[in-house]
């Protein structure tokens, strides 16, 4: 789109912002807490864009003034040089603001603000794959804690040799899905397992699924489609063994999805958790079906969420993490310590760049 089209869209956003401010001053809306909160949230989202739009307009005015000043000082070489330097700086600022506002206008994934259920499954590699699944779980736990998210395991199938055959983690906070969605796919590890006596490097995998939490309104579950069983939650023995059947074994008969939840202290809490996981899994199926046609047109987009997609290799011998979507390497130790900001931000930037190529061809 042309620069004039960008300005027109920004004007529309600015008008919407002004309208929201008028609504916030309305006494009737002030007496409706839910509506007030909704309008305030929308205003808050638009405010950074409107501020950048105003900066862009100011920059355009400064560029125009500088060009007029340049015409008036053509015989003054020193002044001409100073004005040209100022124009270069202003044009750079304008270019940055164009990019920033264009990104802000890109279509948003409505699920980006949601919390998620993070499912990690051991893949190829036997016991080592289970241990690797546990390592990934700790990596995400550290990342979430660093940001300030609530990270809590809600369902786990432990391996006899350590780690997990399968683990579901609830990650709650602001805009969790917008960042963790890039983690969906196959994570491959190359290292010498602790049980390997010959020092040979083994390759193992674990699959990560990132499922945005679904509202009960979005996913209708017929109670007659559920088969619910109970069991005693496991413990370390003695007083820690749960003598009451608090664990929930939930089967959704139409899909065959089974959820076993043991982490909470009561049967009711485990049932609620199991239903949360089931809703997230069913919601993921709905999204995949709804996006089947669209997906063929978005093969190049980062973070498709395809479980068969190998997204990253972690090489312990070389202390290297390779993200195959980015074609970039990162130091292994910080990544496993939960310092995922660099790689996730790079994925976000890549996605935005590709979306801009489609959405914003010809901005000048």
Curated annotation (Swiss-Prot):
One Pfam family from the record: PCRF
Q: What is its main location?
A: cytoplasm
Whether Cytoplasm counts among this entry's keywords is yes
**Matching SUPFAM superfamilies:** Release factor (SSF75620)
Localization annotation = Cytoplasm
Give the coiled coil ranges.
none
Q: How is it modified after translation?
A: Methylated by PrmC. Methylation increases the termination efficiency of RF1.
Does the entry annotate any disulfide bonds, and if so which pairs?
none
**A cellular component annotation (GO) from this entry:** cytoplasm
Q: Which InterPro entries match?
A: PCRF, Pep_chain_release_fac_I, Pep_chain_release_fac_I_sf, Prokaryotic/Mito_RF, RF-1
In the record, what terms sit under GO molecular function?
translation release factor activity, codon specific
Protein origin, superkingdom = Bacteria
Residues annotated as carrying N5-methylglutamine in the record are 239
Going by the UniProt record, its keywords in alphabetical order are: Cytoplasm, Methylation, Protein biosynthesis
Q: Which family, according to UniProt? A: Belongs to the prokaryotic/mitochondrial release factor family.
Function field = Peptide chain release factor 1 directs the termination of translation in response to the peptide chain termination codons UAG and UAA.
Name it: Peptide chain release factor 1
Q: Which organism is it from?
A: Prochlorococcus marinus (strain MIT 9301)
Annotated gene: prfA
């Amino acid at each position: 789109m042309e620069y004039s089209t960008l300005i027109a869209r920004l004007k529309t956003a600015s008008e919407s912002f002004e309208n929201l401010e008028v609504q916030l001053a309305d006494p009737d809306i002030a007496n409706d807490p839910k509506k007030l909160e909704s309008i305030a949230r929308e205003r808050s989202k638009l405010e950074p864009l409107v501020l950048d739009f105003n900066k862009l307009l100011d920059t355009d005015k400064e560029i125009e003034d500088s060009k007029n000043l340049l015409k008036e000082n053509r015989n003054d070489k020193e002044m001409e040089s100073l004005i040209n330097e100022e124009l270069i700086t202003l044009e750079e600022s304008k270019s940055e603001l164009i990019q920033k506002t264009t990104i802000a206008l890109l279509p948003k994934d409505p699920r980006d603000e949601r919390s998620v259920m993070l499912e990690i499954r051991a893949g190829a590699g036997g016991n080592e794959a289970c241990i690797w699944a546990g390592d990934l779980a700790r990596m995400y736990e550290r990342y979430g804690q660093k940001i300030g998210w609530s990270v809590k395991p809600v369902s786990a199938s432990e391996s006899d040799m350590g780690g997990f055959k399968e683990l579901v983690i609830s990650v709650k906070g602001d805009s969790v899905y917008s960042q963790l969605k890039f983690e969906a796919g196959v994570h491959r590890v190359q290292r010498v397992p602790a049980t390997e006596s010959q020092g040979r490097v083994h390759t193992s995998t674990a699959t990560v699924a990132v499922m945005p939490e679904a509202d009960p309104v979005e996913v209708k579950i017929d109670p007659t489609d559920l088969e619910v069983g109970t069991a005693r939650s496991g413990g370390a023995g003695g007083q820690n063994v749960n003598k009451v059947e608090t664990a929930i074994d939930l089967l959704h008969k139409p899909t065959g999805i089974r959820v076993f939840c043991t982490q909470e202290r009561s049967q009711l809490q485990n049932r609620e958790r199991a239903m949360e996981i089931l809703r997230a899994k069913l919601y993921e199926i709905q999204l995949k079906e709804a996006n089947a046609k669209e997906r063929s047109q978005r093969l190049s987009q980062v973070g498709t969420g395809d479980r068969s997609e190998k997204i990253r290799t972690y090489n312990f011998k070389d202390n290297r993490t390779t993200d195959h979507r980015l074609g970039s390497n990162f130091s292994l130790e910080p990544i496993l310590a939960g310092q995922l900001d660099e790689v996730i931000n790079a994925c976000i930037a890549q996605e935005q760049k590709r979306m801009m190529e489609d959405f914003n061809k010809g901005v000048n």
